[in-house]
Amino acid sequence: MREKAEKPAKRKLTRNQRKQIEAVIRQAKGDGKNHTVQDSIPFQNMFPDGLCRLEGGTFSKTIAFEDVNYRLAGPEDQRSIFESLCDFYNGYDPTIGVQVTLDSRSGGSAADEMFGIIRQGNDLDPIRDEAVDILRMQYKRGNNGYVKTKYVTLTIEAENLPAARARFARIETDTLNRLKVMGAAAHVLDGKERLELLYNILHPEGGQFAFEWDWLPASGLSVKDFISPSSFHFGETRTFRIGRRYGAVSFLQILAPEMHDRILTDFMEADGNIMVTMHIRGINQNEAIKMVKRKITDLDAMKIQEQKRAVRSGYDMDILPSDLSTYGGAAKDLLTDLQSRNERMFNMTFLVLHTAETRQKLEIAVSQAASVAQTYNCLLTRLDFQQEDGLMSSLPLGLNRIKIERSLTTSALAVFVPFVTQEVFMGGDAMYYGLNALSNNMVLLDRKQSRCPNGLVFGTPGSGKSMSCKREITFIMLMTQDNVIICDPEDEYSPLVKRLGGQVIRLSPSSTDYVNPLDINLNYSEEENPLALKSDFVLSFCELIMGSKTGLEAIEKTVIDRAVQMIYQPYFADPRPGNMPILGDLMNALLSQHIPEADRVAQALDLYVNGSLNFFNHRTTVDISNRLVCFDIKGLGKNLKKPGMLIVQDAVWNTVTINRAIGRSTWYFVDEFHLLLKEEQTAAYSAEIWKRFRKWGGIPTGATQNPKDLLSSPEIENILENSDFIYMLNQAAGDRKILAERLNISSEQLAYVTNSEPGHGLLFFNNVILPFADDFPKDTELYKLLTTKPSEVAHETVDDEKEDQNG
């Protein structure tokens, strides 16, 4: 007897999910009358893997691709992108339809959510509110709140679903590889992503897309019910209604003999919701050649007729109508291209979709686009009586119902370059770094998502180095729970640190803020014995104060290491603050060895233990557990500044190791970074930080006006190699040349760091290079805290007054 198969358990929907489904059902039913909105959307099925069945045996898939730095590329790089674009189109045979979609639409009210700044009910809320206002203003001022996306939709014919999937597996791989060659990151949209894209197009007024695949059986709805607008109205000749919005679809008549590669860019820079669609289908090569030969034959026949007419009329038979001569020569050139120059023929339909809140705004947007078309000797013509077909052909489904086509060769087609500039617009803890100088889109990035989040800020004095660091510090404090430590050689950060509730530690012989250079915690090293790394620091410290050009001798290193082992034994036996050793303990441990080399090191330490520079011979008296700590080392004299910077670095390492244990990131900002690179010991320690911090959740940033110092030795050069974030402001001529060679900067890109305004420059992040402009609003409290211009700095006390000489 066969057992009954056990029915799978029904998935219980949450209350919120039931509400969302009921809302969709209400929208689908409307007022009880028959509605055909769903029937208008021209596809039959959407599958979870992103495969879509259109009409009959037609299937499509959509790939989203990112922008490429085309505008700022040099002539050779632009030529390379153009040739790659030619190869991209030539790679599709006539059985594959290609639809390129460029979409620009309002980001809506979701903009505030991107900034991630939420009121906390404390003293920083006024700054949070102002920061959100500034970001909102920059967002609207930059790209007017429009988000630009790019897609390519591929269409094939197949007998069934498995056959379609098998063929798309190869086509997808080839497409992704071709886009990668051009430098465009791309990914295949799954079914839910395609539905969300369609939802956003069909709901130009905005809204939240709500859909899960397992809702379909429970609700009895189809996927179209989740993406359909409330209504379509195609009763007018030249416009249509979609929900409460007005729309219009136009087609581009290409009249110019040659096109410019900026036409798509200019269309997409227009205000308003706009979507440009290019439907492209290759023509069989043999058919294309036959077609051109027929044209040549027809032109030759016309030429013969004109010559006969000339003989009968008694004038020179070589005098022909100019159009006939022109077309005849062009047709022969085209035949040569098709037969010997790797050119193919394509049919293209060019559609432009506009949507707007009112009819008046719609007409303004369409007229702006028409002006762009006229600039390039083209006509943008409304699709009279074909608005529904135009809208459905604009959807990224791969279906073209508009049979107004223009035949183009591969080169003529590739002139429609869909690239402008790369964008950095990330989610998560992404922070504001300015506006893209080419697209005016906001630059939002999260350095923690980078392979190597270490950073460098380059700029001449007055270019905005310190202000950019302060802006980043402010947003870290407002948006994350991370720790921030600042090494401040010029006392420029104190007002900001105080306002953000941080702690300023003033290191100077007259200060009572003490930091013990021998502080250690049990997590100080990833090895079992934390003394190994601490001993390395003590060796660097002793080498620095002894001032030996040849470094420590082997015996000196041995006696120092032995002393380090001795002085930490009481602390590790009983780890309480009172047992933490100080420099005096180290000197005594050296003297107790009764070895000349140990005595020599002890004598060098004496100045820092019993002499006038005994500032560091104390246990730590300040609490560096505050989220924001600034080490002000301006008051350290010439003899104390070098060891002081080394000690600050070690204190930073201590904090990083403590935070790693609790899963918290630690940001470390070093202003006037070149001061650390001048001394061998601090430079070596800096290189070690840049090499090791990433594993421990540390994110160092060095700001300097002398980038050439980073190339002074192979060891220091690693700092540049290990920095995936570079914020480059105005550069001196010599530094520009060095950086251009080292970072492969084109002359077009270099113009953005040549005599540039404060806050303007180039941003390097991972593999992206983009020009930015950060014009921070001056009539704000934040600006007064960030600026370092002497005429604009507001200080609370006389001690806080200072001049900014280094940007």
Residue ranges of predicted features:
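Post-Walker A helix-loop "phosphate-sensing" segment adjacent to the P-loop in P-loop NTPases
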Residues: 475-485
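Hydrophobic positions on the alpha1 helix immediately C-terminal to the Walker A/P-loop
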Residues: 468
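P-loop NTPase motor domains
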Residues: 68, 75-94, 101, 105, ...
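Extended, folded cores of ATP/NTP-driven motor/assembly subunits in large transport
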Residues: 1-421
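Conserved lysine of the Walker
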Residues: 465
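Conserved P-loop NTPase
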Residues: 743-798
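Hydrophobic anchor at the beta1->P-loop junction of P-loop NTPases
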Residues: 457
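A short helix-turn-beta junction within AAA+ P-loop NTPase domains corresponding to the substrate/partner-engaging
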Residues: 501-506, 715-728
